[in-house]
Amino acid sequence: MAQALSEEEFQRMQAQLLELRTNNYQLSDELRKNGVELTSLRQKVAYLDKEFSKAQKALSKSKKAQEVEVLLSENEMLQAKLHSQEEDFRLQNSTLMAEFSKLCSQMEQLEQENQQLKEGAAGAGVAQAGPLVDGELLRLQAENTALQKNVAALQERYGKEAGKFSAVSEGQGDPPGGLAPTVLAPMPLAEVELKWEMEKEEKRLLWEQLQGLESSKQAETSRLQEELAKLSEKLKKKQESFCRLQTEKETLFNDSRNKIEELQQRKEADHKAQLARTQKLQQELEAANQSLAELRDQRQGERLEHAAALRALQDQVSIQSADAQEQVEGLLAENNALRTSLAALEQIQTAKTQELNMLREQTTGLAAELQQQQAEYEDLMGQKDDLNSQLQESLRANSRLLEQLQEIGQEKEQLTQELQEARKSAEKRKAMLDELAMETLQEKSQHKEELGAVRLRHEKEVLGVRARYERELRELHEDKKRQEEELRGQIREEKARTRELETLQQTVEELQAQVHSMDGAKGWFERRLKEAEESLQQQQQEQEEALKQCREQHAAELKGKEEELQDVRDQLEQAQEERDCHLKTISSLKQEVKDTVDGQRILEKKGSAALKDLKRQLHLERKRADKLQERLQDILTNSKSRSGLEELVLSEMNSPSRTQTGDSSSISSFSYREILREKESSAVPARSLSSSPQAQPPRPAELSDEEVAELFQRLAETQQEKWMLEEKVKHLEVSSASMAEDLCRKSAIIETYVMDSRIDVSVAAGHTDRSGLGSVLRDLVKPGDENLREMNKKLQNMLEEQLTKNMHLHKDMEVLSQEIVRLSKECVGPPDPDLEPGETS
């Protein structure tokens, strides 16, 4: 057993060593890869630091200028918007005020006209009514003329009729002549009536027109009042909006001013933060490089230690594999040592894996920083393009400066003629040189590494020129008398400077060539950028396709997993059904076990009762045997009283112990009681003889010597049989005690199984039934377990053993009952030959 265990442990140790070796190889490969990646990352970081330092210096000024320009443009836009809003508001206000003044004038005119119409007469009202009243007057005049024409026609007709009537009256005589004045008399009355009616009608019409005009004037006045109220409300709203706009303008102006100040402060803070960040990044990079170098040294040392430990372990394993079969105990000790060393190696491996994880995290952090720096690098490349454009502009400015310098040389030649012009040109040159110095300083800060030593020389020369010019100006201001001599020296210097400027022009041409080369490099970078963008797009498309494929695969896998889940659920249902069947079988087995236990208890009770009866019978038989021995001794001592033997047998037949044995027999000796009853029924005359000596039948006077010898022989045989029975009873007691012990032991085993199963199941689930052997099986044996068949076999074996033991107990009980019956028969049997001769006699 120890040898098998040591071989298993040896195999396990070999497997662990192989795993450690593979892990070591993997770790060494990962370390090599990480080292290569770190070197590439360091190179990238160094290159990016250089580019970052270049671009940051260029950004520090370009950003400020751009942000200031943006803020100024925003401020100008806001001011323009405010001015436009103010102009719009002024125009709206002026139009509203003009409309309001017009409405007020119209209202005043209408009120005056209304008062005049109310106060004035009808004619004046008609005269002042306007074009409508004039139209009515024309209509009325036309009607009046028409009426006059009608009246004229009527008068003519009336005149004709009057002429006819006068002719008739002349023909008839004088009497009708008196009627003429009566007919002509009503004519002026009719004319007066007509005029009166016409005037009346005209007055009525004028009155109606006046009422209509008053109603229209009232409606117009109400409408104008409503419009006035609306316009006043609009005016109030416009004034409120104007005040609001004024306040908003002030707030916007203040906000823009505050924003400009905040942005300037933020620029300064950002500049400081960027400087601090760059310093911090440089420090972190230096610390990371140092830590990487230290980790590399540690890793190399640990790798060497690992290799040495692995070699030592391999040597030990080879030695142990050679001597494993011969030295088992030594292998066990070495296995323990190897376990400790393996534990230490596992700890070292865990530490190394942790360190590797830390390194991976650091590499991921560095990769993230690299991505950020790459993004910043891309921004800087865009800014670099802007700076290149600015560089071209600066080169153009340099060309212009060269032209200006040539012009300055010509002006310097004319300085001897005109001192005042020289002063003015010197001042102009000073201002232009200041601007040139500022531009050159900006270019110096922006293109420090690109232009290099040539630009430094150029800037030094420009600064020297500026210093010389300033010095010359100071000398001109200090001493006017020596200006001519100094100007002559300056002319000589200017000639030399023109030569230097020619050399500078050559350098500028070289710089232009460099700029052209930079433009070519820029085009190459742009092409590379386009290629990178195309590759990025292709990679994105590939990633999208891969994502689609992964999603499709995931959907297919999900479908497969769902089908597998359905199959597993079906299997679980089948297992549940099998579990229910097993639980049913376990419950039936539990019931059977309970029945067998109850039967065993009943049999134990019966066996204990039978043992008690047998012990009682043995005790009584011993007493009887003692009495019989005493009687036999008495008979042997008194050979004359042979008839006492017969009395003894009869008294034994009728003794209370005999009746007690018959009454106190067990359930298993039921046949023995029946036999005793038969014997008692057959031995009634013997009882009567022993109970009443007066009514005894005549007995034989003496027994023969042969009969006495037979009796002694029978007594000896009965005594031997009694001893045999006692030995059998003792054997049965021992076997029953062993059976009781076996039963107690098995019940204790079952109780221990039950307790263990209860403890195990109480941890898992506290609501299961734990009573009996069925609960034990239900708790220990779950459906689908591989040990179910073994447990069933064990239970079957236990049941078979219990059944066989029960069968043996039944057989032993039957044997005991048969022995008891036989003993009772033998005990009852000896008096029969005595009774037979008595009956015969």
Swiss-Prot record:
Regulates the endosomal recycling back to the neuronal plasma membrane, possibly by connecting early and late recycling endosomal domains and promoting segregation of recycling endosomes from early endosomal membranes. Involved in the localization of recycling endosomes to dendritic spines, thereby playing a role in the maintenance of dendritic spine morphology. Required for the activity-induced AMPA receptor recycling to dendrite membranes and for long-term potentiation and synaptic plasticity. Proteolytically cleaved by caspase-3. A minor C-terminal proteolytic fragment of 30 kDa is produced. Proteolytic cleavage is required for JNK signaling activation. Interacts with GRIP1, GRIP2 and AMPA receptors. Interacts (via C-terminus) with MAPK8/JNK1 and MAP3K1/MEKK1; the interaction promotes MAP3K1-mediated phosphorylation of MAPK8. Interacts (via N-terminus) with RAB4A (in GTP-bound form). Interacts (via C-terminus) with STX12. InterPro entries: GRIPAP1. It comes from Homo sapiens. One of its GO terms (biological process) is protein transport. Residues 682-694 have a biased composition (Low complexity). One of its GO terms (molecular function) is ionotropic glutamate receptor binding. The modification N-acetylalanine is found at residue 2. Transmembrane segments: none annotated. Keywords: Acetylation, Cell projection, Coiled coil, Endosome, Membrane, Phosphoprotein, Protein transport, Synapse, Transport. Residues 532-551, 558-580, 681-706 are annotated as: Disordered. One of its GO terms (cellular component) is axon. This is GRIP1-associated protein 1. The record marks 598-599 as: Cleavage. Residues 4-161, 208-641, 701-735, 785-814 form a coiled coil. It comes from the Eukaryota. The modification Phosphoserine is found at residues 655, 666, 668-669, 688, 690-692.
